[in-house]
Each structure stands twice: as structure tokens, then as C-alpha cells.
Swiss-Prot record:
Name assigned to this protein: Giardin subunit alpha-3
Annexin repeats: from-to residues: 3-72, 74-146, 153-222, 226-295
Record's keyword terms, sorted: Annexin, Cytoplasm, Cytoskeleton, Microtubule, Repeat
Entry's family note: Belongs to the annexin family. Giardin subunit alpha subfamily.
Extent of the signal sequence: none
UniProt-listed PROSITE patterns: ANNEXIN_2 (PS51897)
Domain of life: Eukaryota
Function: Giardins are involved in parasite attachment to the intestinal mucosa and in the cytoskeletal disassembly and reassembly that marks the transition from infectious trophozoite to transmissible cyst. They may interact with other cytoskeletal proteins such as microtubules in the microribbons or crossbridges, to maintain the integrity of the ventral disk.
Length: 296
């Protein structure tokens, strides 16, 4: 962080007192989650209020205020809150893509701790309970949240193994490869699979399954290529899947990933223009905040 924590705290306070969601976003977008956490601690010490609470008090609600206040929340706690909500009643499948697929081992471990502290429950157990009636879907997420990835140095072998697994509808082998392959190998495996199988990974997923499991695998494909690719894919769907834009998805993704996925706007070119899609999908203050956070 090039500026001192004290200066950033003062800048953030000034933005909050302006009651400007855009100004608050402009401060947030300059810093990583770890730097924002330092600012958050100093803000609390200086003003005797958490910055996210101060934002909510001054801006008095609304989607834009929620997005920028979440940028100044403790992110493992924020992810835990989102997951608790997603697993209650009818499972929010879109939220699981945002919160579990777009997650790494460190984020997951911190979220499990935060979930236990917040709700006195074990997150993996709660996930399994919520998905108890969907065997294959549950098996995928149970495998995914192990976050046990390592190079195998066998691109062609993995491609052939996938070809056989898809042909035999061996879902668990597909889940294992999708959940354990490292980013540096996955794209090459997917490319080689297309050569040996005569279809893309996306086509293979569609032949294997449908519904939430298909979308989990589809999202995992882009995330395995890279976090920026995964973010671009999900933002594209947030902008185009619903007539008014999926504000809930952007509320989840933006605070958690805007610092990690600085190049998402460039990878978005596969789907269109992120800036234009945000303008078309969202309005007024929300549009402004999202454009600032995603640098478009």
C-alpha cells in the first residue's frame, strides 16, 4: 500500500461523509483485501465504528451502499454470511458458484473458521446437509472443497482419462480431475481433450449432466483456466441472464474478487465488453460503483 493507513482512513471517512457510494468505491478499488483490512482496523480505532457500519448509517441502504459497505467488511465473515443465506431453505445454486467455485484454499479455510464463529456450525457439514437430496451435485462440491490441487505433469494422460470418464458417464473421475488440476495445466488438458475427444469440455459437460451440476462444472472450467476468467464468466451471466441484471451476484462477487481479478475486464472480451454490459444491465449508482470496482 503506497499511502499510509492513516491517510486512507481519512480518505475513506471523507468519502463516507460525502454520502457518495462512488467515492467510497474509488477508495476501495485501490487496495487489496489485506490492505483494506488494515484500514478497517484503523478506522474502527479512530472513529469507534466499523467502516461498513458507518457506510450503512450514512447512505441509508440501497444496492450501491450494500456493495461498497461489503468492500469494507471482514471478507471471510462476509463469505460465511453469504453461504449461510445460500444454504437456508431452497439452495441458492448461483450463490454457490460465486462463493465456492470462486474460492481458493486460504479463502475457504478462513471462511470455515468464520462460519463456525458466526453460526456455531461446521460449514462442510452444513453444505452436505443442504445438498443431501442431490447425490452427484453434492459429490462434486464435496470433492471441490477439499482444495487439494497439485501438478500431475501428464496432460495427454489426463485428457484421455477425461475422454474415457465422459464416455462411461463416470462423474466422480470428472469431479476429481476438475477439482485437483492446477491452473498451469488445466487449459492444456482442456485443449488436448478437445483434440482426442472431438468435443469441447463444455459440450462434454452438457452431454454428461444438466441443471445446477452442469453450471457448476461450466463455471469450474473457467475458474480452472484462471480466476480472472471465472470472474469474467460469472459477471457476463450477471449482466445478461436476467432482464434487470443479477444484482445479488454482483453484490457477492465485487467485494470478494475485485482486487484479485484485476484483469477480468480483459478476459471478458470472450463474451463482449464488460463496461457496456454493466451499463445495459444496471442503473444509476449501482452501475457507477460496479464500473469503478471492476475498472471499466
Amino acid at each position: 500500500m503506497s499511502d499510509t493507513v492513516t491517510k486512507v482512513v481519512a480518505d475513506l471517512n471523507a468519502a463516507i461523509l460525502q454520502k457518495s457510494a462512488r467515492a467510497i468505491a474509488e477508495v476501495a478499488c485501490k487496495y487489496s483485501a489485506s490492505d483494506r483490512e488494515k484500514v478497517r482496523a484503523q478506522y474502527r480505532s479512530t472513529y469507534s465504528i466499523e467502516p461498513d457500519d458507518h457506510i450503512n448509517k450514512m447512505l441509508k441502504g440501497g444496492d450501491a451502499a450494500t456493495i461498497v459497505s461489503n468492500c469494507w467488511d471482514e471478507l471471510p465473515v462476509l463469505r460465511a454470511k453469504h453461504l449461510s443465506k445460500a444454504l437456508k431453505g431452497s439452495v441458492d445454486h448461483r450463490a454457490l458458484l460465486d462463493l465456492l467455485i470462486m474460492c481458493d484454499r486460504e479463502d475457504w479455510n478462513n471462511t470455515v473458521v468464520a462460519f463456525t464463529q458466526q453460526f456455531r456450525k461446521n460449514l462442510p457439514e452444513e453444505l452436505e446437509k443442504a445438498l443431501k437430496s442431490t447425490t452427484s451435485y453434492r459429490a462434486f462440491y464435496t470433492t471441490w472443497i477439499k482444495f487439494d490441487r497439485a501438478p500431475r505433469n501428464n496432460i495427454n494422460g489426463d485428457a484421455l482419462k477425461l475422454k474415457e470418464a465422459f464416455s462411461k458417464k463416470d462423474e466422480q473421475t470428472v469431479f476429481d480431475i476438475m477439482s485437483t488440476t492446477v491452473e498451469s495445466e488445466y487449459k492444456a488438458i482442456a485443449t488436448q481433450f478437445e483434440k482426442v475427444a472431438g468435443m469441447t469440455m463444455i459440450q462434454a459437460f452438457a452431454a454428461l449432466t444438466s441443471g445446477p451440476l452442469y453450471w457448476a462444472l461450466h463455471t469450474a472450467h473457467y475458474r480452472n483456466i484462471g480466476m480472472n476468467n471465472g470472474a469474467a464468466f460469472l459477471i457476463h451471466h450477471a449482466c445478461t441472464a436476467d432482464k434487470k441484471g443479477d444484482i445479488a451476484r454482483m453484490t457477492r462477487l465485487s467485494p470478494l474478487l475485485c482486487d484479485k481479478c484485476l484483469n477480468a475486464k480483459n478476459y471478458y472480451s470472450e463474451f463482449g465488453d464488460m463496461g457496456k454490459d454493466i451499463v445495459n444491465a444496471f442503473k444509476d449508482a449501482v452501475e457507477e460503483v460496479l464500473k469503478v470496482l471492476w475498472r471499466v
